[in-house]
């Protein structure tokens, strides 16, 4: 049995890292913000990368082994047997892949719908590429609101004109709430998209990270989603943010669109990234299972710690990802929000307060769009010792504040 990957590194070892999570703040800050995990590489992934380096295998990526590995994993893990390698393309990472898919099916000025609170780059990447962001907010329960989606699709279609195109960015599982969309919810999305002529692009980067009590359903496996796209990667499941690679997958009716993707896009992924991601999907399942057990334990621990140390803060139990969404509005902290698009590193309200007063870094909810103000996102992919210390600090700061 593989040991818990989340309990293999000390804080002293983690503080030697040079990545964003551990370098963006001073050493006295405990970082529970950006979506990096505090783990070592899965052994089989490390072996594949070391072997490539030892052999000088550091050229350009080639072939379909990455797509084949994802197809095999999807078949075994999710019983999705229709991931046809001929309908895939390698892309540098999921968000750059999203932009490339939008360029295939929309034009500058067209509307792109998102469901906030949602991953901040959904706003930034879309806007910077000249598309208009429209919102279909999640419901009060943090799940997809099909009535809001219908209203947004209808408004977007009316405002787009007779020749306008409309797209919807689905986050499946959803970041930051950790909601894993049900088959019924995804059927609802597909039916509405067909009715209003909206093309769906599904960001499924967190797909391997679904915890007990929920089941991941690939959007492209839903009847009616044949003209959609999905983006997948091992980035989140195996902590490969610095080894970039992702796959764009087209539904049967979208295959011709995907074939129009510029050839130079395939030069963007790192060859070492593709080697690492392929190894993760092919040989990393036992490590992933051990990670999921560790995340299950941390999810339960975090619930207890919030109850103990943060009275008045509402904890929303995530079904997937290693992220949870805390409603801190009852604490009454002022929000000072700058104009314009917010970045994942921007701080306001409770996130700013907890950083200043408890030396714990969280992600500020305002960056996630409508419904995010007064919330924070917590990354619980770390050791239990760090979680306990972080929540204890936050609790002590609140006691002193009051």
Curated annotation (Swiss-Prot):
Pathway: Amino-acid biosynthesis; L-methionine biosynthesis via de novo pathway; L-homocysteine from L-cystathionine: step 1/1. Keywords: Amino-acid biosynthesis, Lyase, Methionine biosynthesis, Pyridoxal phosphate. CDD domains: AAT_like. SUPFAM superfamilies: PLP-dependent transferases (SSF53383). Signal peptide: none annotated. Its cofactor is pyridoxal 5'-phosphate. GO terms for biological process: methionine biosynthetic process. Pfam families: Aminotran_1_2 (PF00155). GO terms for molecular function: cysteine-S-conjugate beta-lyase activity; pyridoxal phosphate binding. It catalyses: L,L-cystathionine + H2O = L-homocysteine + pyruvate + NH4(+); an S-substituted L-cysteine + H2O = a thiol + pyruvate + NH4(+). The modification N6-(pyridoxal phosphate)lysine is found at residue 236. Its EC number is 4.4.1.13. InterPro entries: Aminotransferase_I/II_large (IPR004839), Class-II_PLP-Dep_Aminotrans (IPR051798), PyrdxlP-dep_Trfase (IPR015424), PyrdxlP-dep_Trfase_major (IPR015421), PyrdxlP-dep_Trfase_small (IPR015422). Belongs to the class-II pyridoxal-phosphate-dependent aminotransferase family. MalY/PatB cystathionine beta-lyase subfamily. PANTHER family: CYSTATHIONINE BETA-LYASE-RELATED (PTHR43525:SF2), PROTEIN MALY (PTHR43525). This is Putative cystathionine beta-lyase.
């Amino acid at each position: 049995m593989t040991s818990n990957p989340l309990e293999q590194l000390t804080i002293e070892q983690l503080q030697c890292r040079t990545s964003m999570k551990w370098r963006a703040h001073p050493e006295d800050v405990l970082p529970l913000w950006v979506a990096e995990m505090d783990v070592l590489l899965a052994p089989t992934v490390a072996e594949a990368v070391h072997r490539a380096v030892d052999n000088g295998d550091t050229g350009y990526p080639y072939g379909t082994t990455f797509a084949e590995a994802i197809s095999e994993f999807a078949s075994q893990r999710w019983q999705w047997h229709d991931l046809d390698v001929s309908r895939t393309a390698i892309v540098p990472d999921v968000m750059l892949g999203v932009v490339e898919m939008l360029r295939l099916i929309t034009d500058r000025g067209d509307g792109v719908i998102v469901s906030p609170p949602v991953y901040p780059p959904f706003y930034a990447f879309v806007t910077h590429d000249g598309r208009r962001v429209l919102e279909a907010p999640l419901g009060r329960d943090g799940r997809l609101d099909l009535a809001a989606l219908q209203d947004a699709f209808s408004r977007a279609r009316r405002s787009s004109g007779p020749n306008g195109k409309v797209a919807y960015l689905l986050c499946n599982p959803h970041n930051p709430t950790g909601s894993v969309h049900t088959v019924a919810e995804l059927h609802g999305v597909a039916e509405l998209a067909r009715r209003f002529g909206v093309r769906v692009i599904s960001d499924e980067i967190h797909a391997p990270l679904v915890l007990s009590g929920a089941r991941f359903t690939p959007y492209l496996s839903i009847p009616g989603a044949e003209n959609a796209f999905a983006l997948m990667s091992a980035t989140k499941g195996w902590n490969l943010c610095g080894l970039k690679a992702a796959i764009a997958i087209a539904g049967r009716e979208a295959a011709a669109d995907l074939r129009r993707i510029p050839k130079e896009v395939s030069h963007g992924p790192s060859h070492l990234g593709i080697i690492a991601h392929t190894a993760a999907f092919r040989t990393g399942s036992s490590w992933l299972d051990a990670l999921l057990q560790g995340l299950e334990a941390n999810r339960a621990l975090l619930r207890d710690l919030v109850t103990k140390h943060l009275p008045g803060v509402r904890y929303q139990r995530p079904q997937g990802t290693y992220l949870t969404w805390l409603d801190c509005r009852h604490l009454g902290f002022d929000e000072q929000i700058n104009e314009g698009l917010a970045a994942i590193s921007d701080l306001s309200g409770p996130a700013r307060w907890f950083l200043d007063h408890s030396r714990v870094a969280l992600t500020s909810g305002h960056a996630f769009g409508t419904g995010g103000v007064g919330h924070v996102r917590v990354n619980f992919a770390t050791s239990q010792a760090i979680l306990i210390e972080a929540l204890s600090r936050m609790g002590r700061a609140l006691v002193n504040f009051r």
